[in-house]
Swiss-Prot record:
Gene3D superfamilies according to UniProt: 3.40.50.1400
GO terms of molecular function: ferrochelatase activity; metal ion binding
EC identifiers of the protein: 4.98.1.1
Swiss-Prot/TrEMBL GO biological process terms: heme biosynthetic process
Organism: Paraburkholderia phymatum (strain DSM 17167 / CIP 108236 / LMG 21445 / STM815) (Burkholderia phymatum)
Record's GO cellular component terms: cytoplasm
Top-level division of the source organism's lineage: Bacteria
UniProt protein name: Ferrochelatase
Length: 356
């Protein structure tokens, strides 16, 4: 195996600490070609699709990408922002918010982001951080609940990149924060902030809050993946923080792909059932998504909304994700600070009051 050439650093640039936020990824453009390229990388990951590679690649290349690329491109085009992909835009704002918060608290820490699929990719960003003098790097997945198909594959990509390095940095990883008090408080603050602006559902009259998490195949639960349990844990803590019961609040799973059974209940059919049952208002919030993206804006805000209204529901609200909300940036700073303990960052724990 050939190792990467190490470039000499000036002494002033060395011995730095870095935080790398990692999210799933996004196409570079809302075009069929860009979307096919992105989906080919995403759906070729054996952590995502656990089917023998040879068989799966035939199915993927011949039957999925030619058709799904065009359909998905139209969906991406419907949510694309002037600045680019919503996920990329919100992730960049999270980086800026965290960077600002840490700076206010006298942290001398580099903060950047990478995408597991698409650009900027994890190997490229690790190399960039090394060139900036980072000898200690914290990998911070933006997935609060651990899953092999999200968190683990992000770490896989980082460790593969490390294999090529002659001079490896020290690495720490954040495995999950599904029950972290600051994360739960940020979720509750986001929901309450939305309700303050748009009115609170009339739960006494039967209105519902639906907490929709990204789905995964049920087989992964049977094989020992903790994702389902951690989603339920987050939902229970959030319901408690909001003062709601399981009658007023439902937990569902979205974005099913293929014909295999996934974690249930499914989001879209649940909203259709609620509309048909006479529920007047349904609010949907996605606690597992730390930034708005195709799955929250288009799938929830458009497709699921239509299912609910066409079934008989009257009022639908898609509550925005955490994005760069002050409470979330403060929580992110608290979680990061806890995992940076013992490294030379020259500061104390960030304070939420530091964020405007």
């Amino acid at each position: 195996m050939r190792f990467d050439l190490e470039r000499p650093l000036q002494s002033a640039a060395a011995h730095r600490v870095a935080v790398l936020l990692i999210n799933l990824g996004t196409p570079d453009a809302p075009t069929p070609r860009a979307v096919r390229r992105y989906l080919a990388q995403f759906l070729s990951d054996p952590r995502v699709v656990e089917i023998p590679s040879l068989v799966w690649q035939i199915i993927l290349r011949l039957f999925i990408l030619p058709f799904r690329g065009v359909a998905s491109a139209k969906k991406y085009a419907s949510v694309w922002m002037p600045e680019g992909s919503p996920l990329r835009v919100h992730t960049q704002k999270q980086v800026e918010g965290l960077r600002h918060l840490l700076h206010l608290n006298d942290y001398t820490v580099i903060v950047e982001y990478a995408m597991r699929y698409g650009t900027p990719d994890i190997p490229a960003m690790l190399n960039q951080l090394k060139l900036a003098g980072a000898e200690r790097i914290l990998l911070m997945p933006m997935y609060p609940q651990y899953s092999a198909s999200t968190t683990a594959t992000a770490f896989d990509a980082a460790f593969v990149a490390l294999r090529r390095m002659r001079n490896q940095p020290e690495i720490r990883t954040v495995r999950q924060y599904a029950d972290h008090p600051a994360y739960i408080a940020a979720l509750a603050a986001q929901v309450n902030h939305y309700w303050h602006a748009h009115g609170r559902p009339d739960f006494a009259a039967g209105d519902k809050l639906v907490l929709s998490f990204h789905g995964v195949p049920k087989r992964t639960l049977d094989l020992g993946d903790p994702y389902h349990d951690q989603c339920q844990q987050t939902a229970t803590l959030l319901m408690h923080a909001l003062g709601l019961t399981s009658v007023e609040c439902r937990v569902t799973f979205q974005s099913r792909f293929g014909k295999a059974e996934w974690l249930q209940p499914y989001t879209a059919p649940t909203l259709k059932e609620l509309g048909a049952a006479g529920v007047h208002r349904a609010d949907v919030f996605c606690p597992g998504f730390t930034a708005d993206c195709l799955e929250t804006i288009e799938e929830i805000g458009m497709e699921v909304r239509d299912e609910f209204l066409h079934a008989g529901g009257k009022v639908f609200h898609a509550i925005p994700c955490l994005n760069a909300a002050p409470a979330w940036i403060a929580a992110l700073g608290e979680i990061v600070a806890q995992h940076l303990q013992g490294w030379p960052v020259q500061a104390a724990t960030p304070q939420s009051a530091s964020v405007a």
